[in-house]
Regions:
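Contiguous mid-protein beta-loop-alpha structural module that forms a pocket-lining wall or clamp
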Residues: 259-302
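Flexible, glycine-rich terminal cap/loop adjacent to redox cofactors
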Residues: 7-12, 16-18, 22-33, 45, ...
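Glycine-rich active-site loop/strand segments that organize a redox cofactor
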Residues: 47-84, 308-309
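FAD-binding core/adjacent interface of flavoenzyme oxidoreductases
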Residues: 1-7, 19-26, 35-45, 52, ...
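Rossmann-like dinucleotide-binding cores of NAD(P)H-dependent redox enzymes
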Residues: 87-93, 169-176, 182-238, 287-288, ...
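Generic enzyme active-site microenvironment
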Residues: 29, 200, 278
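Conserved N-terminal glycine-rich FAD pyrophosphate-binding loop of Rossmann-like flavoproteins
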Residues: 33-55, 206-219
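Short glycine/serine/threonine-rich phosphate/pyrophosphate-binding segments
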Residues: 12-16, 184-187, 266
Length: 418
C-alpha cells in the first residue's frame, strides 16, 4: 500500500508528491497527459515565452533608436518561435520528471479515480489496474470555462474557436478574443504585436477582473495604443462560421475566435470522505502558488504537522507589455474594515534603473494603508511589476510572488530544495 496517491500532475500535484516522497512517504503520482499541467504545457510558461518574443520585437521597433541602435530589417519567424516554445516546454517537463523520480515518486501515466474506501486507506483505479493508498490527494486541476453560447460547440469542432490549449501555430490575420482576463489580455498583446488585428469582448465593465481601476485603465490604454479594439460591458449571444454577434445585434468577423472566459475544475471531486482536494480542483482560487501552498498544507497534515497556517497573501500579475501586478486589498476593500484607510501613489520613475531602462513607460505603484499606517495592499503598473509584487509584507505577512516569476526562486532557495 502506498502512503500517498496524488491524482493530477500539475503544480499542486507535483508539489505534493515531491514533498511527500522527500519526507519518506511511499508516493505514487497519476497524470493522464503531461506532467506540469496546463500552466507548464499550454498556459503560463508558453504564453510568457511568446510575450518575451513580442517584448523584444517591440523594443527593437520602438526603443532601440533611443539607445543608439539601428535595428532595421528585423522580422518575425513564427516557425522558429513555435519550435522554441515547444523545446522550452519539453525541457521543463523533462526536468520536472527527473526531480520527481529523484525523490522516488512512482509515476503512472493514466487517468485515475478514487473508487472506494478500504480499511486503512482507499482503492484507486487507473489504466485497468488497482492501487491502494493510505491517503489520496485530489489535484486533478482545471480546464477552460466554455460559456453556453449558441454555436460555440460547432465553432470549436470546426476549429474557428480555440482555447489557449489550441493556439494556432500561425498568426491569424484577425483574432476575436472572448474574455478580458489575464489570458485574454496577454494573448491580445502578443498577437497584436505579431500582426493580428485583435478585438476583445469582455462582459465586465473593465478588463482584468478585480483589479484596481487604475491598473485596468493602464492595461486598456496600452492595448488601445497598439490598435486593439475593446468592447467592455458586452456579451456574445451567438456565434457562427467566422463571426460572433454582440448583444446589440452587430457582428464581428475574425479568422479565429479565442475563448478565455475563465477557469473551472476539470473533474468532479470524489465523493469518498477523507480525500484531500487541492488547487484548481477545489475551485477556490485558480493560481499555481495557491495550489502549491495547499499541497504543502495537505502533506503537513498527512505527516501529523499542524502549524498555524493562514491563507497566504498571493500576488497575481497580468504579464502584458507593460505588466501589472497586485496583492492584498484595494482602497474600497480596506475601507470596509477601516474607514480611515488611505492610499499613496508613487511613480516608478523614482527608481533610477526603471527610468534608465524604460523611457517610453509611465509606470506607478499604489500602496493601500490602514489608518494606523500598516500596508494592506499594493497595486503596480509597469515593467518589473510582477517581480516587485513579491517583495512586500502585507498585513504582517510575506507576499507569495506571482507565477511565473524569478521571485519564486527565493522560496526554493530558502527551503533548500533542488
Amino acid at each position: 500500500m502506498y502512503d500517498v496517491a496524488v491524482i493530477g500532475g500539475g503544480p499542486g500535484g507535483c508539489r505534493a508528491a515531491g514533498l511527500a516522497a522527500r519526507r519518506g512517504l511511499k508516493t505514487v503520482l497519476f497524470e493522464r497527459e503531461e506532467l506540469g499541467g496546463v500552466c507548464l504545457n499550454y498556459g503560463c510558461i508558453p504564453i510568457k515565452l511568446l510575450l518575451h518574443a513580442a517584448r523584444m520585437y517591440e523594443a527593437l521597433e520602438l526603443e532601440a533608436p533611443q539607445f543608439g541602435i539601428d535595428a532595421e530589417g528585423f522580422r518575425w519567424d513564427f516557425e522558429t518561435l513555435w519550435k522554441r516554445k515547444e523545446r522550452t516546454v519539453a525541457r521543463l517537463r523533462a526536468a520536472l520528471r527527473q526531480r520527481l523520480q529523484a525523490a522516488a515518486v512512482e509515476l503512472v501515466n493514466s487517468e485515475a479515480a478514487v473508487e472506494s474506501k478500504l480499511p486503512g486507506g482507499f482503492c484507486i483505479e487507473a489504466g485497468g489496474c488497482r492501487y491502494e493508498a493510505r491517503q489520496p490527494i485530489w489535484a486533478a486541476g482545471g480546464k477552460p470555462h466554455i460559456p453556453a453560447i449558441p454555436g460555440i460547440a460547432e465553432a470549436l469542432a470546426a476549429g474557428f474557436a480555440v482555447t489557449p490549449r489550441e493556439l494556432p501555430a500561425a498568426v491569424p490575420p484577425s483574432l476575436l478574443i472572448l474574455g478580458g482576463g489575464a489570458a485574454g489580455i496577454e494573448l491580445a498583446t502578443f498577437f497584436r504585436i505579431a500582426g493580428s488585428a485583435v478585438t476583445i469582448v469582455e462582459a465586465g465593465n473593465t478588463l482584468g477582473g478585480r483589479l484596481d481601476f487604475r491598473l485596468a485603465q493602464f492595461l486598456t490604454a496600452a492595448l488601445e495604443k497598439r490598435g486593439v479594439k475593446i468592447h467592455t460591458a458586452n456579451t456574445i449571444p451567438r456565434i457562427g462560421d467566422g463571426w460572433a454577434e454582440l448583444a446589440d445585434g452587430s457582428r464581428l468577423t475574425a479568422s479565429k475566435l479565442l475563448i478565455t472566459c475563465g477557469w473551472e475544475a476539470a473533474a468532479a471531486v470524489p465523493a469518498s470522505p477523507g480525500v484531500q482536494v487541492i488547487g484548481d480542483a477545489a475551485g477556490r482560487r485558480f493560481l499555481a502558488p495557491v495550489a502549491e501552498w495547499e499541497a504543502e498544507a495537505a502533506v503537513d497534515r498527512l505527516c501529523g504537522i499542524s502549524p498555524e497556517r493562514t491563507q497566504p497573501v498571493v500576488a497575481r500579475a497580468i504579464f502584458a507589455i507593460p505588466e501589472v501586478a497586485t496583492a492584498g486589498m484595494t482602497l474600497d476593500e480596506a475601507r470596509q474594515m477601516d474607514a480611515a484607510a488611505y492610499e499613496r501613489r508613487l511613480p516608478l520613475t523614482l527608481s533610477g534603473r526603471y527610468m534608465a531602462e524604460h523611457p517610453l513607460e509611465n509606470g506607478f505603484g499604489v500602496g493601500v494603508y490602514s489608518g494606523a499606517g500598516e500596508l494592506l495592499g499594493v497595486h503596480l503598473a509597469g515593467s518589473g511589476a510582477a517581480e516587485l509584487a513579491g517583495s512586500f509584507q502585507i498585513n504582517g505577512r510575506a507576499v507569495m510572488p506571482p507565477h511565473p516569476s524569478l521571485s519564486e526562486f527565493n522560496r526554493l532557495l530558502q527551503a533548500g530544495e533542488s
